[in-house]
């Protein structure tokens, strides 16, 4: 391995100081593909492991936090979605359900799956989930799709819980900082899965990471994490050169066997330069990036009726379960960012070791140039 650069220390930023971690690298929260094992592996290495808990009940979140704490004594983050549902989720009825199901029913039946029946939407409240995080005094609380209520942010501050809010535009970053959020995650449109736009529709908030990061760095005084399209040391160093004080990596960790991704999903992520991604509302009802496959293409066709989030997500699960059993990845929602073709590692610790070694050999001069005002 290359010897780390010593002047300046690239891994010493406000983010590492605030959290007491060794490296300014955050494992992206992977929603339903999160695992306690991956979260702990990243944290034990010296980064910030994250667990995406937005789809979990408060009781289940409490159990997840307890298990993570049996696996690591290091800081970790729990991630929630502030906006848990789209307009119409409560009023969408059986007729809309039947129309949306009609675009999937042929595949479900061909795979031997049972067609689901309509059931009214029963919400999980963000405030109830957040209460569990507050009571557990988690080290870091990250969130997307908006800003938590003031009383929640005030309690985080009082308890020393670091808050990390996602911004997909510079104006979102500004309002997050004005609300007292500690760290801004500047999430470019290259990112896999959901990005969490909240001031404007997601389709109007498609700035790329390496355009967004310097805009956000210039707009706020809070430390900025670069997220989206970063999968190797080159992306990390580029983010540091643009003023980021940390990076968030998703797809590269998703490809590791510690993640909750299926074998078919991980194989697709490791397929190399042939991998292509696209944006769709068809997988969940909210705009998100995944691997371009038959399912994504069919659900993006004109005339396909998409239910509001999270109803569409629940509907698609009725296809995903039999498709997984039948080894039909072309009919699975496969989350991935635009740099997923750079995924090379199947072991999270090996990925981290490679990133740290490669970044250490080149980041010092770049960071010094940036701290001295380079590029401005």
How would you name each of these model-derived features?
Residues 2-219, 355:
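Active-site entrance/lid segments in N-terminal catalytic domains of soluble metabolic enzymes
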